[in-house]
Amino acid sequence: IDFSKVPHRAPTYPDTHTWLNIWGVWDTGWYLNIAQNWYNNILNSHGGANYGFFPLYPFLMRILGFIVGNNFISGLLISNLAFLFGAYVLHKLVSHQSGSETADRAVLFMFLFPTAFIFSAVFSESLFVLCMISAFYFANRNRWFLAGLFGGLVALTRSVGVFISLPLLLLYLQNRTFNLHKIRADILCLAFVPLGLGMFCL
């Protein structure tokens, strides 16, 4: 596979739908390539390889692509649905901590900040945000299995995702009033985060 030929702008069907093509630029070609061909060690003309992109997003693109018949369209659906669900979970999280009025503003700012359009493109950002907010949402409710599970999905979405393990661990210890005698076996659920990274490295 010659990655130098991966399109800067991702083609869709039919070609006349340029209003869809604008949502497929920059890294979209890499995600489409992984969704179609998975990972390999072939470098493009600039020395780049597709294993620099983490697998959860293109994996979901491939799965949904079997249903809708087009990986690019599936990427658009995943990104926009993840964005909407992420906003919903953000509202629940902030509402629980600071009230519904603050939650309304948080979601409004999420939709209106200048680069929010990225969440609608064929990039992994919206999926990353959904999984990250979900991890904190469940951590705040002391549901550590789900918090760790979504933390693991964060680590499978982007390279920086593994660092969510630090605030999750802090929240866990805070919930236990930083008393080591109160630590229970559920702390092991946080191991899903490095496990997610380890699965990709294998």
Named regions from a protein language model:
Residues 1-5, 23, 153-154, 161-202:
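Membrane-lumen/periplasm interface segments of specific transmembrane helices
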Residues 22-41, 46-69:
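Short hydrophobic/aromatic helix or loop-helix immediately within or flanking a transmembrane segment
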Residues 67, 97-98, 112, 116, ...:
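Transmembrane helix irregularities
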Residues 70-74, 90-112:
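Transmembrane-helix signature of polytopic, membrane-embedded enzymes
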Residues 89-92, 109-112, 118, 127-146, ...:
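Specific aromatic-rich, kink-prone transmembrane helix
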